Structure formats: structure tokens, C-alpha cells
Amino acid sequence: MNNGIIVTHNGGNLETEDADVLIKYLNEKLASQYPGIVKFITGIQYRHLLIIKGGNKYVDCAPPHDHPNEEWKPLLVKPMEGVDEALLAGNCDKTPAEDVAENGGILSDEYRMSAQQTADLLNELILKSQEILESHPFNVARKERGERMAN
């Protein structure tokens, strides 16, 4: 990204071993803020996995490769439209963090977020990850060399 515009979806042709360093950093600095709920897993090159325990699958995520040279903010995650309200609803009045706190540091197996809670969490992770990744030494060095940062 550059000035709020998606430049490329592949993190500047990121290599898997470099991505692994960044994924571990995201787990340390970001996933650790959501214990028992969020985990990043290294995949291949720029393709990785995010696990959200108790997340709701009825959200719309815009694939960045479908939106080059577009602003990213209008593409933030939203609950799906036209889906039965029962599918969008969670099964608990508590927030995920409250459930984790009440269950000894892990999310209860029965807990399911609403689609809105899941979208909000994903958007929070997107925003925070940009800040975290921008200051990582790997990206600072890439920027100094005139290369695209992986963000």
C-alpha cells in the first residue's frame, strides 16, 4: 500500500522465509492481544492463514488482488448482506475478551461471534497490523532500499 492505495496484493514478491519472520512478529505483537482467539499461520510467499476461534463465517472480505490501485478503506470487512439474521447473530451477549477472561484464558468451544463482531475484529487486525508491520526492521530496510513494504 502507498498513501491508502493498494499497490500490489503480494507484499512486493515476498519470499516465504521473510514472510515467516513477519507472521511470527504479528503473533507476538498482535495475536497476543487476543489470547485464545487469534492466530496467524505462515503459508507460502504472501499467502497466509488467520484463525479466529469463534469467528462468524458470514462476512464479506474483499480480495486485494481484485482491487489494485484502489483505496483500501472502502474495502474493509462487513457482515454479509442478504443472509438470514440467525446466521449473522452470535450466540452470546459477552464479547470474546469477556468469554476468554471467564474461561481461564481460552475462548469457550461454544462461543460464536456475530458477523458484526467478526468484521470488527478483522478490521481491527487489518489496521493494527499495518502499524506493526511498518515499523518492523524487515520493512524499514525494504523501504530504505526503495522496495515495497510487506503490509
Model-derived regions, located:
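…; additionally, a secondary subgroup of soluble metalloenzymes is captured
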Residues: 1-151
